[in-house]
């Protein structure tokens, strides 16, 4: 069973998938940093809400008087929409970057295909040539 597992892991597609997951996780951290460190402070400043959306919430209970989300959750029910805004912007940026990457790959692939000169058609096999000659000779006799 251990040998089967080694064979499974050693296959190319499993290794490619593992590399893709690792690169995806690292890329996700980069996008998180772009959103949290670059985009959200600008959006927060433009909306007049400061630089941090994580403490944006609506109290659902009259007992909630706290100013931070953590303290408000201890006091009662809250509708914490600030983190959702951050995650949604993160998703939009990630989706846009993936779209641009796929567009770039498709453009490069199309460019390579256009550069390829069409290969001349291979001559028909010898047996096809002989059969064609026989057919032509039979047509002439008829």
Swiss-Prot record:
It comes from the Bacteria. InterPro entries: Mechanosensitive_channel_CS, MS_channel, MSC/AndL, MscL_channel. Gene3D superfamilies: Large-conductance mechanosensitive channel, MscL, domain 1. GO terms for molecular function: mechanosensitive monoatomic ion channel activity. Keywords: Cell inner membrane, Cell membrane, Ion channel, Ion transport, Membrane, Transmembrane, Transmembrane helix, Transport. It is found in: Cell inner membrane. It holds the Pfam family MscL. The keyword Ion transport applies. The chain crosses the membrane at residues 14-34, 82-102. Channel that opens in response to stretch forces in the membrane lipid bilayer. May participate in the regulation of osmotic pressure changes within the cell. Belongs to the MscL family. HAMAP family: MscL. This is Large-conductance mechanosensitive channel. It comes from Sinorhizobium medicae (strain WSM419) (Ensifer medicae). The lineage of its organism: Bacteria, Pseudomonadati, Pseudomonadota, Alphaproteobacteria, Hyphomicrobiales. The gene is mscL.
């Amino acid at each position: 069973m251990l040998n089967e597992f080694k064979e499974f892991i050693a296959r190319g597609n499993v290794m490619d998938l593992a590399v893709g997951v690792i690169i995806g996780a690292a890329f996700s951290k980069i996008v998180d940093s772009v959103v949290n460190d670059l985009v959200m402070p600008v959006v927060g400043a433009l909306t007049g809400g400061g630089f941090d959306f994580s403490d944006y919430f609506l109290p659902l209970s009259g007992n909630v008087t706290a100013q931070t989300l953590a303290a408000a959750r201890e006091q009662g029910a809250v509708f914490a929409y600030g983190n959702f805004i951050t995650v949604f912007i993160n998703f939009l940026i990630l989706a846009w970057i993936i779209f641009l990457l796929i567009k770039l790959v498709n453009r490069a692939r199309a460019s390579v295909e256009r550069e390829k000169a069409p290969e001349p058609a291979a001559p028909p096999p010898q047996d096809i040539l002989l059969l064609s000659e026989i057919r032509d000779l039979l047509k002439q006799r008829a």
